[in-house]
Amino acid sequence: MVHTTSPLLLLLLLSLALVAPSLSARKCSLTGKWTNNLGSIMTIRAVNSRGEFAGTYLTAVADNPGNIKLSPLLGIQHKRACQPTFGFTVHWNFSESTSVFVGQCFIDRSGKEVLKTKWLQRLAVDDISDDWKATRVGYNNFTRQRTVEE
């Protein structure tokens, strides 16, 4: 007995066999230069074997924009996942505040890397009675800045 297979089914199976490995093999990488939805620029240097990384953050927004300075960041990510979760802290060099970000590195449907983050910013206050207003919460979405060669 001979079975015939439709050409459409063969084409579909061949397409899946060729496309599926490339989708799963692509890994989202934190290393590089990123811009968020507000225009801030973040640079993450190489992630080490333990998932630790360092970099810089230049915010585009601040209570006193004239004082903005490049600020250091330190973080860690999970290394095994293709779309890893991560967290980092920014020590602001121009104000008495610290921010922590948590997020995940995604590859969107068009193949672009996107960092989806939530953050807390702790401001210094002079009195414990002002504690209620010392923590801000927000989100940022970062996209990779492409180099000239890309």
Swiss-Prot record:
Keywords attached to this entry: Biotin, Disulfide bond, Glycoprotein, Secreted, Signal
Keyword Signal: yes
UniProt-annotated location(s): Secreted
Origin: domain of life: Eukaryota
Residues in Avidin-like domain copies: 26-147
Residues annotated as signal peptide: 1-24
Cross-referenced InterPro entries: Avidin, Avidin-like_CS, Avidin-like_sf, Avidin/str, Avidin/Streptavidin-rel
GO annotation, cellular component aspect: extracellular region
Disulfide bonds: C28-C105
Glycosylation sites: N93, N141
GO molecular function terms noted in the UniProt entry: biotin binding
Gene3D superfamilies noted in UniProt: Avidin-like (2.40.128.30)
Protein family per UniProt: Belongs to the avidin/streptavidin family.
Subunit and partners: Homotetramer.
Name of the protein: Avidin-related protein 3
